[in-house]
Curated annotation (Swiss-Prot):
The active site is at C97. SMART domains: RHOD. Residues 14-137 form the Rhodanese domain. This is tRNA 2-selenouridine synthase. SUPFAM superfamilies: Rhodanese/Cell cycle control phosphatase. It comes from Escherichia coli (strain SE11). PROSITE patterns: RHODANESE_3 (PS50206). Monomer. PANTHER family: TRNA 2-SELENOURIDINE SYNTHASE (PTHR30401:SF0). Keywords: Selenium, Transferase. Belongs to the SelU family. Its EC number is 2.9.1.3.
Length: 364
């Protein structure tokens, strides 16, 4: 039976997006998992808890016996069927448990007895997790160029189009503002960090990487925070600022936050519920900055939002949203970003419109 256990192997698994059959309990998987992992547990949460209690009270032999008793008969067969199907569907995959201990070895031995020789990760998830952390620390030492600019400047798209760009917001499943959530739930902090490490490893492996191109982010992106090693390097990085005309920014925001989000909600939930979700999304975003706007200004903008939604529902036009979006940008988002940028003005090395910044970055 096969095992993989070197540091180089661990990095290769992350770079290749090797399918991982993670046999830990769902509660462990939810706390942190590798990007290409699927959760097919040997024990569910209740079974794991019972075995853990038995181990503390009666020792390892009794706990092992209880585990075999709980996962037997039809339950074992159902889980075997799921593992077998996953192995056949992912012939290049590997098994993984918490530390490469009994759980992955038990599943491996059961599969071997059924005629499937499938490798496992010696050291388990813990070893992969440490590899991800160390890789991020090392790769963050390369030079970084940050793409800055006011809301609607197309920063994320510019980063996405660079071969050495890493889309932090895409990995975090959040666009970083009060209106930043997407239809995908954010990952746990550990899973986000693992995904980021894998993306950095893959990007670095594709080319002779000299520097990273990242969006100028705050420490938090929604509920995820950037690893401290990367955040520290970003505070020292050069910044290229996109300065597009206000009208161009409005066009981008209309496409991203009104047209696309309405489409995505409708596609996910259907016309009626999708519309309600879309309305709630916009109201929730505005409500999140109520305190900073002040109650009177918030109420005015919320009323304009309601009017714009009524117009959009009846005519399909999103033009009405400009009545609240324009003042929100001019009175809140733009002054806030300019204030933040002033504090790191010495880091700004280039300013220009979107295409000019893209060309400048390409030449680095």
């Amino acid at each position: 039976m096969q095992e993989r256990h070197t540091e180089q192997d661990y990095r290769a698994l992350l770079i290749a997006d090797t399918p991982i059959i993670d046999v830990r309990a769902p509660i462990e998987f939810e706390q942190g998992a590798m990007p290409a992992a699927i959760n097919l547990p040997l024990m569910n949460n209740d079974e794991r808890a019972a075995v853990g209690t038995c181990y503390k009270q009666q020792g390892s032999d009794a706990a092992l016996a209880l585990g075999h008793k709980l996962v037997a008969g039809e339950i074992r067969q159902q889980r075997m069927d799921a593992w077998r199907a996953a192995c056949l569907q992912n012939p290049q995959g590997i098994l993984c448990c918490a530390r490469g201990g009994q759980r992955s070895h038990i599943v491996q031995s059961w599969l071997y007895a059924a005629g499937i020789d499938y490798p496992l990760v010696e050291g388990g998830y813990k070893a992969l997790r440490q590899t991800a952390i160390q890789a991020t620390i090392e790769l963050a030492q390369k030079p970084i160029v940050l793409i800055g600019g006011c809301t609607g400047s197309g920063k994320t798209l510019l980063v996405q189009q660079q071969p050495n760009g890493v889309d932090l917001e895409g990995l975090a499943r959040h666009r970083g503002s009060a209106f930043g959530r997407t239809l995908q739930p954010q990952l746990s902090q550990a899973s986000f960090e693992n995904l980021l490490a894998a993306e950095m490893l893959k990007t670095d492996a594709r080319q002779n990487l000299r520097l990273w191109v990242l969006e100028d982010e705050s420490r938090m992106i929604g509920s995820n925070h950037l690893p401290e090693c990367l955040r520290e390097r970003m505070t020292q990085a050069a910044i290229a600022v996109v300065e597009d005309p206000f009208e161009i920014r409005l066009e981008r925001l209309n496409e991203e936050y009104f047209l696309r989000m309405h489409h995505d909600f409708t596609h996910a939930y259907g016309d009626e519920q999708g519309w309600q979700e879309y309305c709630e999304y916009l109201h929730h975003g505005l409500s999140a900055i109520k305190r900073r706007l002040g109650l009177q200004r918030y109420n005015e903008l919320a009323a304009q939002l309601d009017t714009a939604l009524t117009t959009q529902l009846t005519t399909g036009s999103t033009d009405g949203h400009l009545a609240w979006l324009v003042p929100l940008l001019k009175e809140y988002y733009d002054p806030m970003y300019r204030y933040q940028l002033e504090k790191k003005a010495e880091k700004v090395v280039f300013r220009g419109e979107w295409a000019e910044v893209a060309e400048w970055v390409k030449a680095r």
